Amino acid sequence: MTSPTLPADRVLLSPDARRAAVIDLIRGARTRLALSLFRCNDKGIFRELAAAVARGVDVEVLVTSRAKGGKKKLRKLWQRLEETGATVYAYNDPVVKYHAKYAVADEGPALVASLNLTKKCFAKTCDAVVLTWDPEVVHGLRQLTATDRDGIAPPANLTPRLILGPETARRQFTDLIRTARSSILMIDPKFSDPDLMALLDQRRADGVRVHVHQDCRVGTMKAHGKIMLVDGARAVVGSLALTALSIDFRREVAIQITEPSAIADIQSLFTSIGVTAAEPGSVPAAAGGAPC
């Protein structure tokens, strides 16, 4: 018997599509839902979580224990989540700050995002949501939820599609940049890691086309999500910024994508802001404006 063909990975870039993807994943959960978030103030998300619990779904939410605004703001978030009936766990590593943004429903699909579940990110930011049915990604995120919830080391056998900060992020991003053959395009207003900046300089000298968009705006949207496109064939979307703090001292999750239709959508995003017009070897410090 042949295995059923899984749906192709999708990348959602428009504000309405991003929010709909999150809502649909929660609504589609039948028995269990794992959600990892940093911020959430969207009433619709809270309603959907409560509805999932009401229909018998086991909902677990993993959240940060440290954020700007202090404990009062976090307690309000925890209270709102607990009111839905979800079981809430706080990530309590004494050094590593929690910033991962993903969700898994049942045995799939899984969602990896660059955005927070906030009214602002659902309306005013340049962000991306990746939806995947890849069983290795689904299983890996399930494992990661369990280990982070229990305060133990993450699994060592995660699919290489997942980029995990701080454990593997530096090595994986270094490999992506080192192995690029023709182009490296990035949207990352916070990009500042010295080692990766030096590596991009080296690749630029090798003749690789490099463009880093560091403007505070991406078209009409506020720059927030971190998106990388390598050789027009591999993309990375997730919570990571290419800063030393984000790479080395935060729980972050990003996902690598090669699905052609998803790559085409990401390429269209870069084209819409003129990034592909960069000449080989160029790396504008801030395409379209001053650095954030």
Language-model features, listed with the residues they occupy:
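HKD-type phospholipase D/PLD-like phosphodiesterase module
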Residues: 1-28, 36-179, 187-270, 274-275, ...
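Terminal interaction modules at protein C-ends
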Residues: 289-292
